[in-house]
């Protein structure tokens, strides 16, 4: 190995050159790498924070869904109860209405029956009076004879009771 050989000095020069170039570039490269590392760490932290936020949001959303499902089922139950109450009330009202109409119809029929019976009695009495009056006129009895005959007839059933 000869120290005066140009390849040797070329190699030494190249090593010195590399050292001189690497020395200032080392800081720039390290700073750049540190910046990239910090950037990656920051992104990882952001991703972890987003993951935690998403998990929290998922929990919160599930809790809200459960609350809403509970509320929905409660509302359905309440509406079913209200519907049943309304149906019972309306059924009761209809039954009362029908019972009232039935009693009104019965009362109307009884009134009509009473009226018809009264009319028939009145017609019958009028007809009997008319027939009796015609009979007495045909027999040509006087009022005193009518009274006398009526008195005699009223005594007759009593005598009949004594005879037996």
UniProtKB/Swiss-Prot annotation:
Q: Which GO terms describe its cellular component?
A: plasma membrane; proton-transporting ATP synthase complex
Transmembrane residue ranges: 7-25
- Predominantly, its location class is membrane
**A GO term for molecular function:** proton-transporting ATP synthase activity, rotational mechanism
Q: Sorted alphabetically, which keywords does the UniProt record give?
A: ATP synthesis, Cell inner membrane, Cell membrane, CF(0), Hydrogen ion transport, Ion transport, Membrane, Transmembrane, Transmembrane helix, Transport
Domain of life here? Bacteria
Give the record's membrane topology.
Single-pass membrane protein
Please name the Pfam families in this protein's record: ATP-synt_B
Q: Where in the cell is it found?
A: Cell inner membrane
Instruction: Report the family membership.
Output: Belongs to the ATPase B chain family.
Q: What does this protein do?
A: F(1)F(0) ATP synthase produces ATP from ADP in the presence of a proton or sodium gradient. F-type ATPases consist of two structural domains, F(1) containing the extramembraneous catalytic core and F(0) containing the membrane proton channel, linked together by a central stalk and a peripheral stalk. During catalysis, ATP synthesis in the catalytic domain of F(1) is coupled via a rotary mechanism of the central stalk subunits to proton translocation.
Q: How does it assemble?
A: F-type ATPases have 2 components, F(1) - the catalytic core - and F(0) - the membrane proton channel. F(1) has five subunits: alpha(3), beta(3), gamma(1), delta(1), epsilon(1). F(0) has three main subunits: a(1), b(2) and c(10-14). The alpha and beta chains form an alternating ring which encloses part of the gamma chain. F(1) is attached to F(0) by a central stalk formed by the gamma and epsilon chains, while a peripheral stalk is formed by the delta and b chains.
Output this protein's name.
Answer: ATP synthase subunit b
Organism name: Rickettsia conorii (strain ATCC VR-613 / Malish 7)
Q: Which gene encodes it?
A: atpF
């Amino acid at each position: 190995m000869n120290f005066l050989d140009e390849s040797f000095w070329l190699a030494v020069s190249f090593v010195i050159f590399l050292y001189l170039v690497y020395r200032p570039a080392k800081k720039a490269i390290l700073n750049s790498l540190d910046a990239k590392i910090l950037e990656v760490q920051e992104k990882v932290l952001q991703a972890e924070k987003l993951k935690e936020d998403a998990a929290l949001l998922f929990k919160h959303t599930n809790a809200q869904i459960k609350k809403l499902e509970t509320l929905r089922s409660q509302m359905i139950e309440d509406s079913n109860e209200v519907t049943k109450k309304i149906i019972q009330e309306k059924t009761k009202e209809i039954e009362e209405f029908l019972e009232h109409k039935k009693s009104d119809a019965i009362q109307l029929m009884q009134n009509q029956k009473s009226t018809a019976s009264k009319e028939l009695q009145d017609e019958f009495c009028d007809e009997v009076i008319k027939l009796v009056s015609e009979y007495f006129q045909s027999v040509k009895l006087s009022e005193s004879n009518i009274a006398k005959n009526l008195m005699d007839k009223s005594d007759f059933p009593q005598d009949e009771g004594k005879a037996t």
